[in-house]
Structures are given as structure tokens and as C-alpha cells.
């Protein structure tokens, strides 16, 4: 993909990739959340596991170092609602943006708090 969906996360004051805590039935869990959040039928969403990364990172929420297990999935939408064709859009009060990796790398706040994840996505999706 040449652009990725990110959203404004007020707690971090940063644009982040969509993210969810790992769940027992992780792929269904992710599809259900994306379906609900983006107002797309779950049968129009497919998901593919790409990679995993375990590392230590500073938690903005907890103000301490924590160990994270990041699992990367690529999501494909069979239908693409008109609202999502804009560079930015809002659904249920959440502001979303389509951004390229290079745009993320130029964003100082993303570099400060999430460069490791941008690099992880870049390594596995290019």
C-alpha cells in the first residue's frame, strides 16, 4: 500500500495506526472492530497477518517503560465508502487520515512517540 489509515489519538496527541489489544480470536476481533468503527460490513473486510515484533517502549498512558507485542495485519476492504476516499474524514467523532510512510516520517510527533512502529510497518509492507 502507498497510504495507510491512521487516526487522531487524543491521549497521545498523535496520529496512530489502528490498534487493538490482542484477543483470543484476534482476526475476527479486529474485523469486528473495523466494521463497527468504519461502518463497513464485516463480510467486506479481509485480513492478513504480516509480522510480529516484541520490544520495550515508553508508555505514554502509564508513564513508564513497557514490553509490547505488536502484531501487524494488512486489511483489505472490498467496498470503499465515499467518505473514506477523502484524505481525511470523521466517523463517530474520530478523525482519520490517509498517510504515506514518508508523511509519517515528516511528522515530528509521530517520530517522537511512534517511529518504531512506522519503521516496523515500513519494513513489512513495502
Regions found by a protein language model. Give the residues of each.
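Nudix hydrolase/Nudix homology domain
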Residues: 10-22, 66, 80-126
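A generic structural micro-environment signature
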Residues: 23-28, 46, 56, 60, ...
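Glycine-rich loops and low-complexity Gly/Arg-rich segments
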Residues: 31-32, 40-43, 71-76, 99-101, ...
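Active-site-adjacent beta-strand/loop module that shapes the phosphate/pyrophosphate-binding cleft
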Residues: 53-86
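Conserved Nudix-box catalytic region and its N-terminal flanking loop in Nudix hydrolases
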Residues: 2-41
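A short coil-to-beta-strand element that immediately follows conserved catalytic motifs
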Residues: 41-53
